[in-house]
């Protein structure tokens, strides 16, 4: 069995925003913060895998977990050499627990999608003024060795805001600008059915290609057989449920880490069927509307 080298682990599904490209209301269960006891059990259940990179995020704002500093510390205790990544929406006041988290996080994404009006539209009820206040507070935070970057989800309505946000990034001494073309996380909806994810004008695409192609994340040469999720990754929800990837958050779980081991779950028929479908470029219904696959022509056009 292939070893897991990448983990996407959700420790809370609480969130203070209702972003336009997030389907959390359709897929989450009861609001929950994972207990430190359960978090310890989860880590114990996957510690035999050589995880090299992990993202502590999911359908919630990670920093809303009341013990997220301990969550990060415990993870690094089990996986000291693993690159730990966290994304935050910056819509809160920085406190001592946030400052403590910085000791353990290797890369921190500040999610800033758009400028002023478009930011508040797509990340409602976020306020631009709150973001600016957060950035001002962050100036006094010890970053330790954490690489703090800007993550920008590009859609058909905020393409022209990129340069303004890049200026804000530089003014606040932040790292790389990471542009992610917006995707659909619902397997029942195609990107082509949504104007925000498919309505780019030729002018927009040319602008992205000519000015920002080095900042755009993703691979233009990709097919189902290239999917790393089915071979080397794990996606867990706050309940401990195992799903295949973050592109299909609405899928039925393959199992639960608090009921079966991760290795047992990955050997189950349903899991293996999805894996084999990707490996043979004959995807099952689970992957038929994969938004990453739909993204390939756009990434190819903009020269990624």
Model-predicted regions and their roles:
Residues 10, 25, 29-34, 44, ...:
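Radical SAM enzyme [4Fe-4S]-AdoMet core and its adjacent flexible, acidic
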Residues 56-60, 87-89:
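Glycine-rich beta-strand-to-loop/alpha-helix junction loops that act as flexible
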Residues 65:
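Active-site-adjacent beta->alpha loops and helix N-cap segments on the catalytic face
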């Amino acid at each position: 069995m292939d070893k897991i080298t990448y983990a996407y682990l959700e420790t809370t599904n609480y969130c203070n925003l209702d972003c336009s490209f997030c389907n959390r209301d359709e897929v989450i269960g009861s609001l929950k913060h994972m207990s430190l006891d359960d978090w310890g059990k989860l880590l114990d259940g996957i510690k035999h895998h050589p995880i090299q990179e992990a993202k502590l995020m999911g359908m919630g704002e990670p920093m809303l977990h009341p013990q997220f500093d301990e969550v990060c510390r415990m993870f690094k205790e089990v996986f000291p050499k693993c690159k730990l990544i966290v994304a935050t929406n910056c819509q809160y006041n920085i406190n001592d627990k946030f400052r403590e988290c910085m000791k353990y996080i290797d890369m921190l994404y500040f999610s800033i999608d758009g400028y002023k009006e478009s930011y508040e539209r797509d990340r409602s009820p976020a306020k631009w003024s709150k973001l600016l206040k957060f950035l001002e507070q962050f100036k006094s935070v010890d970053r330790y060795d954490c690489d703090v970057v800007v993550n920008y989800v590009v859609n058909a309505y905020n393409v022209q805001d990129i340069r303004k946000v890049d200026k804000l990034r530089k003014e606040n001494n932040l790292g790389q600008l990471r542009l992610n073309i917006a995707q659909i996380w619902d397997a029942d909806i195609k990107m082509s059915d949504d104007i925000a994810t498919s309505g780019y004008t030729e002018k927009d695409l040319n602008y992205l290609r000519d000015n920002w192609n080095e900042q755009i994340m993703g691979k233009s040469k990709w097919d189902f057989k290239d999917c790393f999720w089915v071979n080397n990754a794990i996606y867990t929800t706050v309940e401990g449920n195992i799903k295949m990837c973050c592109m299909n958050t609405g899928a039925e779980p393959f199992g639960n880490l608090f009921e079966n081991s991760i290795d047992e779950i990955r050997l189950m028929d349903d899991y293996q069927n999805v894996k084999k479908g990707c490996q043979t470029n004959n995807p099952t219904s689970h992957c038929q509307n994969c938004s990453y696959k739909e993204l390939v022509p756009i990434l190819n056009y903009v020269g990624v």
